[in-house]
């Protein structure tokens, strides 16, 4: 009797294990993935063609001549010697403009759709070994063809080295596959100042523009990692909100007018909206201000389909030097009146250091907080 019970128990266990294996097999090979417009059969991803057409439909056509749009008529950064320093390193950083290779295809040939997100934290020496083809300053160029888009990635930064290494790992992997002529500019604010994301974006645009004839600029938070390689970091027809679906927000827009996280604009767009506001010291407001000035300039914010424009956000704690800006709503309430005079046209800063790191260009800047707050107090006397 005991033997029959034991045999029966083993038989039940066997059937349970078989059922579990069949269920796992079905989940892997038959069930649609989390990406709504993908299905998985074996290990082959079948993309929704309409989604990719929407991406390409939002990509601007660019000039065949890589240097014909370079407008070098910029005002001095703040001191003449800084501008001269940039002129000296420009040929070292970006080399010769002569090209004999064919242009890259409009659709990069090696895209697969959803990709692995690297969350490990390799040190810089390891990353340099992983991406040996990257030129000084974090400049990547395709070797087999001439890139159709010249893109500067602007990253506002302070005291998040682990996040920076993770982001560099993910971005270099993605951007090389997309056959872009790109460089990553990390704009680092000096210590003992309230963080100012919008102004750092303006500084990054200003510094990057002096080094190379970029066609477009992608303003990129350090804690956002792309999940799909069809999310092209190319020049947009209209200003593009790129971080449409973020895991922290359950891959949904928190609100319809959001324009934060990652935004892509051509040089013409940036000039038309006068860049970002310089006046949002602390957390919040500058992204909504950006949306308002984009609308005021007669432009519209575009987005890729949510199943492509997906990001993972690296978790982080609240930073003492980035407190909530309690005056953000008062400043935002005046954007329609102030946007033409608050931005690139009023940008003041001091370039402390410019370094060509193997994987990125590092610009350390003093945003002159005390001086700028005194000027801002005239418009908002109860805030500062």
Curated annotation (Swiss-Prot):
Annotated SUPFAM superfamilies: Nucleotide-diphospho-sugar transferases
Positions bearing carbohydrate: 37, 71, 81, 98, 192
Record-listed Mn(2+) binding positions: 223, 316
Domain of life: Eukaryota
Compartments it resides in: Membrane
InterPro entries according to UniProt: Galactosyl_T, Galactosyl_T_C, Galactosyl_T_N, Nucleotide-diphossugar_trans
This protein's name: Beta-1,4-N-acetylgalactosaminyltransferase bre-4
Source species: Caenorhabditis briggsae
């Amino acid at each position: 009797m005991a033997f029959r019970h034991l045999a029966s128990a083993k038989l039940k266990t066997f059937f349970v294990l078989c059922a579990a294996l069949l269920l796992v097999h079905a989940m892997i090979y038959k069930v649609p993935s989390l990406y709504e417009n993908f299905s998985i059969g074996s290990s082959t991803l079948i993309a929704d063609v309409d989604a990719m057409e929407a991406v390409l439909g939002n990509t601007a056509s660019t000039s065949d001549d890589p240097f014909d749009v370079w407008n070098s008529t910029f005002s001095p950064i703040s001191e003449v010697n800084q501008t001269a320093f940039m002129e000296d390193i420009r040929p070292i950083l970006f080399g010769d403009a002569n090209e004999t290779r064919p242009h890259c295809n409009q659709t990069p040939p090696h895209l697969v759709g959803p990709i692995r997100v690297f969350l490990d934290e390799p040190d810089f020496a390891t990353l340099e070994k992983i991406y040996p083809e990257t030129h000084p300053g974090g400049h990547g160029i395709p070797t087999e063809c001439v890139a159709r888009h010249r893109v500067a990635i602007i990253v506002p930064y302070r005291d998040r080295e682990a996040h920076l290494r993770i982001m560099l790992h993910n971005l270099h992997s993605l951007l090389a596959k997309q056959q872009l002529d790109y460089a990553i500019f990390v704009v680092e604010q000096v210590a003992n100042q309230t963080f100012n994301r919008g102004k750092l974006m303006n500084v990054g645009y200003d510094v990057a523009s002096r080094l190379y004839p970029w066609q477009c600029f992608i303003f990129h938070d350090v804690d956002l990692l792309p999940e799909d390689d069809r999310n092209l970091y190319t020049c947009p027809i209209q200003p593009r909100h790129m971080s449409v679906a973020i895991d922290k927000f359950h891959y949904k827009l928190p609100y319809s007018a959001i324009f934060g996280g990652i935004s892509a604009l051509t040089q013409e767009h940036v000039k038309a909206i006068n860049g970002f506001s310089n006046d949002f010291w602390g957390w919040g407001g500058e992204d909504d201000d950006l949306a308002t000035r984009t609308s005021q300039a007669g432009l519209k914010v575009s987005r890729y389909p949510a199943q492509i424009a997906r990001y993972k956000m690296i978790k982080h704690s609240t930073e003492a030097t980035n407190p909530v800006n309690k005056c953000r709503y008062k400043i935002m309430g005046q954007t329609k009146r102030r946007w033409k005079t608050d931005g690139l046209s009023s940008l003041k800063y001091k370039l402390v250091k410019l370094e060509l790191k193997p994987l990125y260009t590092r610009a350390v800047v003093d945003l002159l907080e005390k001086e700028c707050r005194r000027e801002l107090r005239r418009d908002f006397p109860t805030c500062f």
